[in-house]
């Protein structure tokens, strides 16, 4: 059985362009969505108040591309795109995405590197992508220089992204800045017009997006211009059923180096929204900007929503009355956290979604038009999904869990230098194997909603019963003394496997209780809310922080390594 989007949202607002760059598509007005002036603020730096309109962005993209063309010797109409790869490794900046669009104007591809990557990871990814230039910021300059030098990169091709952050020990760096490149480009002659006669948006790559599952194995997803434009249109279509004629002020705290954050920046710019962009996440600074700019939409991850839910004092310290919608992705939103935030802010619409870097990005999204508590929403238009049982047969009924496969015009073509065979990632008909176990349920309106059960490789069997760790984790983070938690499977002679919880203690609640007593309290809490296969007993360990990947997912293989090390 093939699951699709609801009957009221079957097609996208307009065709996906087949001969256009994603930046040009986003920047041009006249889509028929919202009547927004080209001089209205499109992106604002939360720290300095500096803003860019679409007119400013278009000017900067043009000037940047001219400067880079002169320095690198590239132009759009000549050369292989995979020989024109530029790495961007920086904290958020209002220049970040326009920079990527300037690189696209030269026929180049942007490799997005996460700021928390180690020097060895940076070197591995730069080498694999055959990087020819790097844009980075002062805090990351040293490791980027080391990585680029290690792959014999030209040091003069390392450029600086300026950030509005104070420096503890100011360091003078002579690298050319984006501001200098824009200024220099203003005096250069225009580049040759883009020859798009043979350009295919489906085939031409826009971004190299590193991605890793809980295995920790780094891969690079090859994302085309059409992939990004498709998901912009899919999200815009779903969103248009409730907000077709209005623009919003939105909060930009998601890393632009991550697919979710990058998509949001493209999506809100296309809609005509104004995004208040933060270089990095700081809860109090973020909430202050919500108050200052009267932000309407928050794009968050579950851990931040959980932190808000467990710190109600924040709602007294800051005026958050402007907020109407909270969109969350990157990981599952525990139902207990959703209920807690709803009690604090019943006027907020909480809209969970589901997606992958490989599907760039969003596959399902909760529309105010169709709700189902605990779900990740309905499939977006043009997204198809299948569920396979243990025998590989298609599940044909609602309410039955199976391995989730998806197909969409936004799904990547393949991984770069694929170490995994394509038939491991995709089936013979082009369906992407997500690695997630999911189910579909119908709400009272008859719309099919997607529920993510857990990662396939994380689900444990206790006495033959499948136990998803995410369900235990959802209850753990609802405990007042728990800030964060991750659950893994351990071997058990009688049950086969049992859950083992790694818990980060709250620094504000029940701090006077010793670890033994708190373990007993948490264990009793789980026993009172879940059935016997989910019980933790004494399988609880307190740690300072849950190790996580760049996109906020728990690295459970590292937690399992801790168990092996401690038992050795």
Swiss-Prot record:
InterPro entries: AMP-bd_C (IPR025110), AMP-bd_C_sf (IPR045851), AMP-binding_CS (IPR020845), AMP-dep_synth/lig_dom (IPR000873), ANL_N_sf (IPR042099). Pneumocandin B0 is the starting molecule for the first semisynthetic echinocandin antifungal drug, caspofungin acetate. Pneumocandin B0 is a minor fermentation product, and its industrial production was achieved by a combination of extensive mutation and medium optimization. Inactivation of three of gloP/GLP450-1, gloO/GLP450-2, and gloM/GLOXY1 generates 13 different pneumocandin analogs that lack one, two, three, or four hydroxyl groups on 4R,5R-dihydroxy-ornithine and 3S,4S-dihydroxy-homotyrosine of the parent hexapeptide. Disruption phenotype: Fails to produce pneumocandins or any new compound that might correspond to a deacylated peptide core or free dimethylmyristic acid. ATP binds at residues 211-219, 352-357, 436, 455, 553. Coiled coil: none annotated. GO terms for molecular function: ATP binding; CoA-ligase activity. Both substrate-binding domains (SBD1 and SBD2) are involved in the substrate recognition, and are sufficient to confer the substrate specificity. This is Acyl-CoA ligase gloD. The gene is gloD.
């Amino acid at each position: 059985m093939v699951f699709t989007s609801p009957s009221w949202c079957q097609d996208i607002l307009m065709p996906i362009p087949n001969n256009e760059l994603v930046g040009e598509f986003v920047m041009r007005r006249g889509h028929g969505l919202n009547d927004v002036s080209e001089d209205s603020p499109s992106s604002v730096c939360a720290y300095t108040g500096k803003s860019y309109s679409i007119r400013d962005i278009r000017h900067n993209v043009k000037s940047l591309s001219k400067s880079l063309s002169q320095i690198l010797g590239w132009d759009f109409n000549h050369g292989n795109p995979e020989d024109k790869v530029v790495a961007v490794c920086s904290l958020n900046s209002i220049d970040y995405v326009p920079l990527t669009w300037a690189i696209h104007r030269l026929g180049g591809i942007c490799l997005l590197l996460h700021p928390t990557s180690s020097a060895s990871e940076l070197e591995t990814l730069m080498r694999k992508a055959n990087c020819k230039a790097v844009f980075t910021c002062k805090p990351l300059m040293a490791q980027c220089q080391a990585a680029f030098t290690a792959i014999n990169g030209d040091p003069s091709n390392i450029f600086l992204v300026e950030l509005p952050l104070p420096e503890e020990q100011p360091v003078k760096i002579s690298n050319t800045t984006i501001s200098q490149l824009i200024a220099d480009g203003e005096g250069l002659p225009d580049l040759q017009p883009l020859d798009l006669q043979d350009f295919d948006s489906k085939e031409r790559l826009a971004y190299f997006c590193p991605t890793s599952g809980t295995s920790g194995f780094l891969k690079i997803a090859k994302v085309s211009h059409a992939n990004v434009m498709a998901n912009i249109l899919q999200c815009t279509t779903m969103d248009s059923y409730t907000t077709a004629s209005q623009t919003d002020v939105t909060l930009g705290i998601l890393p632009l180096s991550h697919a979710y954050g990058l998509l949001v920046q493209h999506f809100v710019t296309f809609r005509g929204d104004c995004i208040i962009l933060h270089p990095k996440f700081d809860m109090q600074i973020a909430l202050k900007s919500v108050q200052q700019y009267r932000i309407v939409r928050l794009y968050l991850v579950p851990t931040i929503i959980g932190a808000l839910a467990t710190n109600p004092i924040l709602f007294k310290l800051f005026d958050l009355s402007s907020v109407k919608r909270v969109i969350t992705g990157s990981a599952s939103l525990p139902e207990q956290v959703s209920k807690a935030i709803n009690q604090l802010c019943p006027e907020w619409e909480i809209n969970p979604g589901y997606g992958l870097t490989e599907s760039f990005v969003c596959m399902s999204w909760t529309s105010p038009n169709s709700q189902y508590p605990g779900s990740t929403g309905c499939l977006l238009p043009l997204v198809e999904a299948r569920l396979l049982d243990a025998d590989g047969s298609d599940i044909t009924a609602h309410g039955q869990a199976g391995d989730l496969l998806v197909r969409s015009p936004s799904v990547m073509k393949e991984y770069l230098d694929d170490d995994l065979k394509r038939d491991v990632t995709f089936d013979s008909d082009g369906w992407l194997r997500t690695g997630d176990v999911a189910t579909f349920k119908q709400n009272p309106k008859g719309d099919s909603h997607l529920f993510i059960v857990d990662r396939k490789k994380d689900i444990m069997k206790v006495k033959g019963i499948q136990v998803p760790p995410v369900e235990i984790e959802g209850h753990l983070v609802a405990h007042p003394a728990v800030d964060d938690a991750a659950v893994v499977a351990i071997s058990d002679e009688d049950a086969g496997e049992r859950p083992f919880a790694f818990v980060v203690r709250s620094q504000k609640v029940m701090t006077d209780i010793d670890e033994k007593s708190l373990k007993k309290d948490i264990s009793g809490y789980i026993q009172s809310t879940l059935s016997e296969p989910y019980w933790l007993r004494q399988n609880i360990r307190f740690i300072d922080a849950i190790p996580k990947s760049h996109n906020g997912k728990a690295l459970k293989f590292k937690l399992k390594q801790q168990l092996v090390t401690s038992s050795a």
